[in-house]
């Protein structure tokens, strides 16, 4: 299968692999299957980094961050994979998404800081998001670009 071969080659050539996980046992089982398969094909497991998305308090989901880390360990080292980003699930994020307002443009918001840390890890440098140019009142009123 060409798609499978292409995906495998991309993984083998990657400097880093970011595995997005959530606080969900079913998702972690799927992620463990992926990690197990990569290990069996002699993939360099040191390339793997975790991104934990939609973090909620343990009491609301039944599984905490420590359990996520414990469930996903590097078989070569016996230690959890590095976590490069922890992105919380908040009502602000849901509201911004539903209103089609990019929350990431609010530089003081925790979500923006989390995304900035992730981008900095990926590009290997401090990342500063450019602010969009604000439209004039008339442009917003009449919908011009």
How does the language model describe each region?
Residues 98-145:
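NTP-binding/hydrolysis catalytic cores, primarily Walker-type P-loop NTPases
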Residues 66-74, 95, 117-120, 140:
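Charged/polar, solvent-exposed surface patches and flexible loops
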Residues 34-42, 58-66, 89-99, 124-133:
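Noncatalytic linker/hinge segments flanking ATPase motor cores
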Residues 61, 77, 86, 108-111:
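Short amphipathic alpha-helix initiation/capping segments at coil-to-helix junctions
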Residues 1-82:
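Conserved catalytic-core segment of NTP-binding enzymes
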Residues 55-56, 72-103, 115:
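Beta-strand-loop-alpha "switch" segments that mediate conformational coupling across diverse proteins
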Residues 27-31, 49, 67, 85, ...:
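Generic hydrophobic/packing signal
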